[in-house]
């Protein structure tokens, strides 16, 4: 069995892991928050973390079935984690964010700017289903 340390840095096993609890404002440091509460964001999801990292230029890997070990509630919305490559095989930084903490802070800063976090946003599936239901109500019987 080979150790993870012997794998190249580009191997997905060597990528850093980001759980939503790491940047959740409602979590304490004991519950797993890794950045200061001032910089943290309320109720981040693994999908939001993935979207932010993809928009910035990272190549993130979303693992929806994984759970944070310290999280007792195991809610499906916050379930999941994201893996990101931090360094190239030669040890140089892959992006301008060189450390885990820099990536955590950047993600927490960008999540409130997502469309889904803007006031007045409705999910497309909710809007289309309500329009379809409204169309059915207006039908007349023959």
UniProtKB/Swiss-Prot annotation:
It comes from Caenorhabditis elegans. One of its GO terms (cellular component) is nucleolus. Its main location: cytoplasm. Belongs to the SRP19 family. PANTHER family: SIGNAL RECOGNITION PARTICLE 19 KD PROTEIN, SIGNAL RECOGNITION PARTICLE 19 KDA PROTEIN. Residues 115-142 are annotated as: Disordered. Keywords: Cytoplasm, Nucleus, Ribonucleoprotein, RNA-binding, Signal recognition particle. GO terms for biological process: SRP-dependent cotranslational protein targeting to membrane, signal sequence recognition. Component of the signal recognition particle (SRP) complex, a ribonucleoprotein complex that mediates the cotranslational targeting of secretory and membrane proteins to the endoplasmic reticulum (ER). Binds directly to 7SL RNA. Mediates binding of SRP54 to the SRP complex. Component of a signal recognition particle complex that consists of a 7SL RNA molecule of 300 nucleotides and six protein subunits: srpa-72, srpa-68, SRP54, F37F2.2/SRP19, F25G6.8/SRP14 and ZK512.4/SRP9. It is found in: Cytoplasm; Nucleus, Nucleolus. InterPro entries: Signal_recog_particle_SRP19, SRP19-like_sf. GO terms for molecular function: 7S RNA binding. This is Probable signal recognition particle 19 kDa protein. Pfam families: SRP19 (PF01922). It comes from the Eukaryota. Gene3D superfamilies: Signal recognition particle, SRP19-like subunit. Disulfide bonds: none annotated. Residues 123-135 have a biased composition (Low complexity).
